[in-house]
Amino acid sequence: TFANNAVEAITGSPGIGLTRIAFRQFHGRNTEIHVADFDGHNAKRLTLDNSIAAGPEWTPNNNTLYYYSYRRHNPDIYSHNLQTGARRTVARYSGSNISPAVSPDGRRLAMVLSKAGSPDIWVGSANGTGLRRLTTTKEAESSPCWSPDGRWICFASRASGSTRLYKIPANGGAMSRIRTIGVVNATEPDWSPDGRAIVFTTMRGGGVFEICIVPPGGGNVEVLATGEDPSWAPNSRTLMFTKRSRGKRVLSVLDVPTKRVKTLPRSFPGNCSQAAWTK
């Protein structure tokens, strides 16, 4: 398409003109999941929970979204087929059931469950069965994401006191820290589709959030922009993230090599955050 070709001509990377995003939008005290084209057009509200719905995550075929919702007064994980509208419960245990992350082959789901005590990383099949607990720390784990080869899960943990990045084999094993030199707290990791980098959020003094990037093996951190909630586009060059502008949360696009930031051509009413790009 023209849009895809134009993006590729400018960036040298495959276009994103046909991609879509899912995100949460604030409606008073509630948040609902919405979907739209990556530029903000053709927006559609997906959930009508009149509650808190958050953490959208696409399946690789882009026809189903996972998210969690408080619609039953407890954070539970759901899958939502965008073609049929069918919604099913994936994880509904006592405590928190949040942060679903789909494996690259679409067959497995990582999530944060607190049914055994503190919030830990668990992995199960895509429908939530066959659960296996990966982390057993006494501290809170959060924000799991998969390596593109499906072998590793990266996440944030307070196991060492401050929140830092770790990885663990998806089939079980020891967790190891990903060094983020120059940053003392790191959360919300997202592994690039080409496997070359992990972006994450850090909080500086004064409550300022920054988007940073680090090699998957750890190392020096580069600050990309002020913001939070980073999500890679399929081209491993472009990020969607949340920027605070004039007291409002807006979705913005970042070209990683040039660090150029643009707000979406079509903005949404109200605050928006937690954008997730199609695979």
What are these model-predicted stretches?
Residues T1-K279:
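Sequence signature of WD/YWTD-type beta-propeller architectures
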